[in-house]
A protein has these predicted regions:
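Auxiliary Fe-S-binding modules of radical SAM enzymes
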Residues: 1, 205-207, 213, 235-238, ...
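Basic, glycine-/proline-tolerant helical and adjacent loop/strand elements
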Residues: 32-34, 66-73, 101-114
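Conserved SAM/AdoMet-binding glycine-rich loop
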Residues: 81-229
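Conserved, mostly hydrophobic/aromatic
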Residues: 50, 76, 172
Length: 253
């Protein structure tokens, strides 16, 4: 019987793999044909929830989902192979509040869980090993996690650059450079952490790929109208962008 409950990882994978070869894919107008492939991008849900489930950003729904539920690399790779069988070429790894905390260590104990490079590498290389894969892009990154754990984050960044298609973006949710907004909304990334993370991504990701685009760049998110905001907030945001530009760092958007 149906009830209001959180799905398990096993249920999630069962339905996702069934959907990979369903009419939602095979009858999609953007799928195209074998001779003339269309632009369809198949988005995979990698995990749900956020590692900040105990005290996450006040405006966000993700912490309400509780402890993150991760799907295994093998389950996701199987789903994407089924999608390839149905004619899909392009894939985006979605549903991730932070690419760097996929199967991270210390999620229950730490404010900044430690990134685990092995599972995400297994997933990305497993997907890229299929010659049918065209474009591969990913989802968000938490700059504070990257800044607090530079060594494992650098290893993950190298893997992303090796396996993703050029033009890939890691969305960084700074939301605001204003300390008052930061405190009022329980944000966990400050401008110094942000710049540290941007430097790391630029170190490896600003090289250009075969299509002429930088391999991997940060995308910077701001939110207007948050608690604690003032006219000065916008000047702080602008000053931060000027600092990033003066340092010669690249952003995708």
């Amino acid at each position: 019987a149906w009830s209001h409950q959180r799905r398990t990882a096993e249920q999630w994978t069962e339905w996702a793999q069934a959907g990979a070869s369903s009419k939602a894919v095979t009858d999609h107008p953007d799928l195209g044909s074998e001779k003339r492939p269309g632009p369809l991008t198949y988005e995979v849900e990698v995990y749900q929830g956020c590692v900040r489930y105990k005290r996450g950003c006040k405006f966000c729904i993700e912490p309400k989902k509780g402890i993150p539920i991760w799907r295994t690399p093998e389950d996701i790779i199987k789903e994407v192979r089924l999608a390839h069988d149905a004619g899909v070429h392009h894939v985006r790894l979605g549903g991730m509040t932070d690419t760097y905390t996929y199967m991270a260590d210390g999620v229950r104990e730490l404010e900044y869980p430690v990134p685990n490079p092995e599972p995400i590498a297994r997933l990305l290389h497993g997907l890229r090993d299929d010659e049918r894969l065209g474009v591969l892009h990913t989802d968000n990154g938490n700059p504070s996690i990257i800044a607090e754990h530079l060594e494992p984050s650098e290893e993950i960044t190298k893997t992303l650059v090796e396996t993703l298609s050029d033009g890939a973006v890691l969305s960084f949710g700074l939301e605001s450079a204003d300390p008052s907004v930061h405190e009022a909304n329980w944000l966990n990334c400050d401008p110094d952490q942000l710049k540290s993370a941007i430097r790391l991504i630029n170190k490896h990701g600003r090289v250009r790929g075969e299509r002429g685009l930088p391999k991997l760049l940060p995308g910077l998110n701001f939110i207007a109208g948050l608690n604690g905001e003032s006219k000065e907030t916008y000047q702080m945001n602008l000053d931060l962008l000027h600092d990033i530009r003066r340092e010669g760092l690249l952003l995708r958007r």
